């Protein structure tokens, strides 16, 4: 630890521990006020001080209760961004999602993790937890063939660091060029074992995406222009890179057949399914995901939750017993039955 770190520690203790103002800290240390500000920032970066905000609205509010009742969820946590902006929203969703996972993960948990900007935000805000025997399983391929990054490795790495866990990764693209190539790769013993493990995790944490031409899932270099256009036209969202329509059916079966990772029907079989998603642009994708039973636990921002509650209550399509059957969310036909 060098002299700068020691000085930062002293500044942190005076400012946060003793309640001195930055000007008073500057006087104590014999430095300028801007220097104190830099020392406090350094202290936060080094982890010398951790600021925890407990907002009771995140766990107990009328909105959360209504969301639980509307979508028959086990738990709903509401992020309450202090100001507008996508970066602020992502950070708050990630923080609340990380707090929920800290409660759910215990010794021996098999945790399935997806990727995306929201998942990366969750991963960067996880706190170290004293658990053992935890394994982190990547739920879908994450290699990109473009300049867009999925941050899959960094996301998985952060989860492993927080929970002292072993990683089971899928070093593959999420969508292959052909069904034949995908099937050959899936026959590899290592790949097959990770995919099988993903179907048996105790907890799955994932996000959903809106589908437009700027979506990350459409810009990894794995889809043709025609396929992108069709997905934008037909799909309302994607979960684990499985694109679905407004009625819950698979938007483009030929793309779904080339996709490596957990299917929507297998996702529904996971005992605890944590969906972390927010923003007005994702409202329709979140609504369909919840109505089709993709999640048991939800982390969402308050404004988007209110938007969903304002929707007319639709008939809730539910997944039939067997995947691929007529009306299944994993088939191209719409859902008609409820459970």
Task: Give a label for each model feature.
Residues 34, 38-110, 124-132, 144-149, ...:
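HTH-adjacent hinge/linker in prokaryotic transcriptional regulators
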Residues 7-26, 67-84, 109-114, 119-120:
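Short N-terminal secondary-structure initiator segments
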Residues 2-12, 16-30, 35-41, 47-54, ...:
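Conserved phosphate- and dinucleotide-binding cores of soluble alpha/beta proteins
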Residues 315-333:
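Intrinsically disordered, low-complexity tandem-repeat regions
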Residues 79-81, 139, 170-172:
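Conserved beta-strand termini and adjacent loop/short-helix elements that scaffold enzyme active sites
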Residues 135-143:
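Catalytic or ion-translocation cores adjacent to nucleophile or general acid/base/metal-coordination motifs
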Residues 118-129, 216-225:
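Short Gly/Thr/Asp-enriched flexible loops that form oxyanion-binding sites at enzyme active sites
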Residues 111-121, 211-212, 279-282:
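Gly/Ser/Thr-rich loops at beta-strand to alpha-helix junctions
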């Amino acid at each position: 630890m060098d002299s700068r770190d020691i000085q930062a520690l002293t500044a942190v203790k005076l400012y946060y521990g003793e309640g001195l103002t930055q000007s008073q800290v500057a006087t104590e240390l014999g430095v300028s006020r801007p220097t104190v500000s830099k020392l406090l920032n350094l202290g936060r970066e080094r982890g010398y001080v951790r600021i925890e905000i407990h907002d009771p609205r995140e766990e107990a509010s009328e909105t959360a209760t209504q969301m639980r009742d509307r979508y028959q969820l086990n738990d709903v946590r509401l992020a309450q961004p202090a100001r507008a902006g996508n970066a602020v929203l992502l950070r708050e969703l990630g923080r609340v999602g990380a707090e929920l996972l800290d409660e759910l993960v215990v010794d021996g948990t098999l945790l399935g993790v997806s990727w995306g900007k929201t998942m990366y935000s969750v991963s960067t805000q996880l706190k170290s937890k004293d658990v053992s025997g935890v394994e982190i399983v990547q739920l879908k391929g994450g290699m990109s063939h473009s300049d867009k990054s999925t941050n899959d490795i960094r996301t998985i790495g952060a989860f492993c660091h927080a929970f002292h866990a072993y990683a089971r990764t899928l070093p593959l693209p999420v969508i292959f060029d052909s069904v034949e190539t995908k099937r050959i790769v899936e026959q590899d013993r290592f790949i097959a074992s990770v995919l099988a493990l993903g179907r048996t995790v105790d907890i799955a944490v994932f996000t959903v995406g809106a589908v437009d031409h700027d979506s990350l899932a459409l810009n990894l270099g794995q889809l043709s222009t025609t396929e992108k256009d069709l997905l934008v036209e037909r799909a309302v969202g994607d979960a684990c890179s499985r694109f679905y329509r407004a009625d819950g059916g698979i938007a483009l079966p030929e793309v779904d057949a080339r996709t490596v990772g957990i299917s929507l029907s297998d996702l529904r079989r996971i005992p605890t399914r944590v969906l972390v998603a927010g923003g007005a642009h994702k409202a329709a994708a979140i609504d369909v995901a919840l109505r089709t039973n993709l999640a048991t636990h939800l982390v969402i921002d308050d404004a988007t939750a209110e938007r969903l509650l304002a929707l007319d209550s639709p008939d809730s399509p539910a997944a039939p017993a067997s995947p691929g059957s007529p009306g299944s969310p994993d088939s191209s036909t719409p859902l008609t039955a409820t459970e």
